C-alpha cells in the first residue's frame, strides 16, 4: 500500500480591503493612494471616460458602459452614469466578490461618480460586503444645479452604504492659503480617504499591544448613517493629547463633530518609545467627545518603527444621523388600477343585492299604494328630479298634480323591490264606464287589449 503524504498548503486567512475609485475624482484619489504606497488594500478604478482611465496608475480598470457611452464620458448626467454601471455590473461584481470591505470614493455632482457609485454600492450590499462611501461635494462656484445633483446622489448612495463620509470641497478653503495650488488642495481631500483606509489596515496588519480583528471593525463601521474620520500626528510634549485633538477636529469633513455617534474606532500608533500613559491620555481625550453613553467604542494600539518620536491617532465615528438614513427597498413591478386593500375588504363585507326586472304586464290597472323599501332609501335624494316627492301621492287630486308617467314607472319599480303592494287612491289608469263612447284611438294599446 502506498501512502501519499502531502504537505498542507499555506492558507492565508485575512480580510480583503478594496478601494474602488469611481469617475475622475475617484480615480485621482486612488492615484494619490498608490503614489503614497499604501499597504494592505487592493485598488480598482472605474470610469466612463476611456482617456482618463488610460492614465490611471491602477492596474485594475473597468471601462463602464462601453455601449452606453462609447468611452466618451457621461456628459454630467447621473442617469447615463447609472446606466453605464448597470451595463458593466457583471465585471464590477467580479472585482468585488472576494472583498470583505470596500471603500467607494467618488465626486458627487457630475455624471459618472453621482450615477455609478450608488450602483456599485448596491452590488456590494447584495454581496454582503462592508461598504464605506467617501465622497466629495462641489465648490460653491460650481453652481446650484451641480450642488442639487450632488445632494440627490448622496441620498441615493446613503441607502446602500454602511457608513458615509462627506467632504465638501468648499471646506478646502479652511486649510488652504493663497499659495496653495489647486492640485495640492485636492490632495488634502484625498488624504482624508488615505488616512481612513490606513487607520483600518494598520489595525489588522501592524503588530501591537492591542490588535483588532475584522469583526471588531465591522461592528463599528456597520452602524449606518454619516461618519466622521480624522487622523492627527504630533511630537514633543503632550504629543498624545495634541494628536488626539487634531484627529477629532478635521476641518474638511461635513460632520466634524462626534456628537450622536453610535460607534467609535480608535487607533493609536507610535514607535517603541510610546508609553502607556500616552495611550491612555489619547483614548480618554477622544472618549470625552462622545456624548452617547451607549456608543460602541473599540480601541486598538499598534507599533510602527517609522514613527519614533511621534504619535499618530486615527479615529472613525459612525452612526451619526443614523435615524435619517433612507431604507433600501428592492424595486417591484408597477401595477395600475389596484383597489386599496381596505376598500376591497369593505366591498367584500357588503352583501350582494340582485334586483329582478319587474313584469310590467302583471301590474293591475286598479288603485295601488306604493310604500318605501329600505333598499331604496338611498334614492330618496333623487326623487324630486323624478317627480316622486314624498307628498306627491298623499295629496288630493285638487291640490296636487297627477304623477307623471315616469313617476308611475319609478313607483312600480320601488314596489317590486319591496314586494309590498297596498291599495290606496293612486290612479295608474282606469276606464270609466261613462266614457265608453270615447274615441278608441285615445286609449293606450295595452289598455285596449285588457278591455277587449
Swiss-Prot record:
Residues 432-452 are annotated as: Disordered. One of its GO terms (biological process) is FtsZ-dependent cytokinesis. Keywords: Cell cycle, Cell division, Cytoplasm, GTP-binding, Nucleotide-binding, Septation. One of its GO terms (molecular function) is GTP binding. One of its GO terms (cellular component) is cytoplasm. The keyword Cell cycle applies. InterPro entries: Cell_div_FtsZ (IPR000158), Cell_div_FtsZ_CS (IPR020805), FtsZ/CetZ (IPR045061), FtsZ_C (IPR024757), Tub_FtsZ_C (IPR008280), Tubulin/FtsZ-like_C (IPR037103), Tubulin/FtsZ_2-layer-sand-dom (IPR018316), Tubulin/FtsZ_GTPase_sf (IPR036525). Residues 433-442 have a biased composition (Basic and acidic residues). Its main location: cytoplasm. It is found in: Cytoplasm. GTP binds at residues 24-28, 111-113, 142, 146, 190. SMART domains: Tubulin, Tubulin_C. Essential cell division protein that forms a contractile ring structure (Z ring) at the future cell division site. The regulation of the ring assembly controls the timing and the location of cell division. One of the functions of the FtsZ ring is to recruit other cell division proteins to the septum to produce a new cell wall between the dividing cells. Binds GTP and shows GTPase activity. Homodimer. Polymerizes to form a dynamic ring structure in a strictly GTP-dependent manner. Interacts directly with several other division proteins. Belongs to the FtsZ family. This is Cell division protein FtsZ. It comes from Rickettsia conorii (strain ATCC VR-613 / Malish 7). The gene is ftsZ.
